[in-house]
Amino acid sequence: SPTNNFATFNPLVNVLNNPTLSEGNLKTTYAASNLWNGSFGTMSVSSGKYYWELLGSGSGYFAGLFLDDGTVNYAASPYTYAQVGMVMIYGEGGSNMSRIDNNDVSGKLFGGTLAGDVIGVAVDMDNGTLAAYNNNVLKFTMDMTASGHWGAPMIPAHMQHSYSGSSSTYNFGQDSSFAGNKTAQGNQDGNDIGDFYYTPPSGFLALCTKNLPSVDVIPSEHFNTVLYTGNNVSGRGITNVGFRPDFTWI
C-alpha cells in the first residue's frame, strides 16, 4: 500500500467549464476559449508551511489558495476580487505578474511570466503569508492576513482564462519534470521528501500526507447510534448525536 500521498487536483470539484485533468490529475487542459476554468486540490491546510510549483503557461492564470469552508463561490470568475477567501497570484504571459491584495491587483506588477517558466508558491499558514517565485527568483511576499482573504482551512486552486487546448501542469512534489516537459532536478524539502525543480525555501515542505499533522480519529466523533421512541409527531428533532451527520440511516 502507498506510504505517502501527494496533493493533486480533485476531478470531482472541477468547475467553470470543467477542464480536463490528466498526468495523474496534475495537468489541467482547458476546453473552452475565453471562458474561466477552475481546478482545486485534494488536500487543505490549516497550519504549517508548504511549497508547490507550476509550469507557467503563456496566457492568463490565477494560482494560489481558496478558503475550503464553503465561503468562496467556486463557480464565479476570479475577477470578482471582492470574494473573501481568495488569495491568488495572477500571471499573464509576457506581460505581468500580480497579486490579489485588498480586492485589487492594479499597480502591483512584478515583471512578465513566459510559457515554460516555473512558478513557485510558498504558503506559510502559521504566519499568513504567500510568496511567489518565478524561476526561483522571489517576486513578492503577500500578507494574507492584511488582505482580508485569509483563513483556515485553505485549499490549492488554479483558474485560467485561455484558449481552447491550453494547459498548466503542477508539481506538489511528485514530478519535477512536469510530465516530461522539463529535465527533472530531484530537489527535496527539509524532510528529504519530494521531487522539485527548485529547492523549496527553508522550512517549507511538500504538500503530502507525511508532512501533514497527524490526526486522531475518534470513532464517536464520526459514528453514533441514537435510540428514540416514535410519537407520531411531524417535525420532531432527534438530538444528542454528538456531531452534525452527513448521512443518517433510520
Predicted region positions:
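PRY/SPRY (B30.2) beta-sandwich protein-interaction domains
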Residues: 1-250
